[in-house]
Amino acid sequence: MNTNSNTYTVIYSIILVVVVAAVLAFAAMFLKPTQEANVKKDTISQILAAATVEAGADVLDTYKQDIEAAILVDVEGNKVGELDIADCQVYDNSELKRQITAEPKALPVYIFKNGITVVPCYGAGLWGPIWGYVGFEKDLNTIKAVCFGHKGETPGLGAKIADEPSFAAAFAGKTVGKGEILFEIVKPANRQTENNGVDAISGATITSQALGNTLNQWFGFYKNYLEKNVAVCCNECCAEVEPVNTVEE
């Protein structure tokens, strides 16, 4: 065949494209299990951080040792399923994104032996997705710790939602509101309540508001579950308290 002909060029190009595509497809298939394992470990690391559980040398072992239950609930607060703890089954960001529009929803709740309950959130930031995990105290209303992440927020500004320890620390002790706005991240002058929000990051107003909107939306998803289980928790606590004998002998 004439190597200078158009036919040769076309055939050569087609063969080259097919070979490269096959190599890339094989590489993607070969690397997929490793990539999925890394995503799972990263997700669990963030969940553990929100639960204030120090990850050991093996993140998966730490999770299995410290988790008490991993369940799925709907927006009515009813349990609709369980996640496999032995397999370290968790919802990654793709599944969290799907749950935003899913009907009915199956929302993950991670309950740890130290009394912390962790719920996730996922939404849109300024330049890409943002997500996070919120750990609640036993009253299921007071925040113990948070862990946030992002993909593409501006370094030194919006990226501080994940990189700035003081921002995450500001959430400790805050509570979820009871009105239309459950939580907000705005400038101090614009905040409606002191307890149900934190200050926006200076220079990153849009990212801060986006995270506030994301938290507000997901707290809304979990509102019924949190309120129902607060009542259960209170009843259990009351049952454990022995009545005081006020009659003098």
Residues covered by each model-derived region:
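Flexible, solvent-exposed loop/hinge segments and secondary-structure transition points
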Residues: 2-249
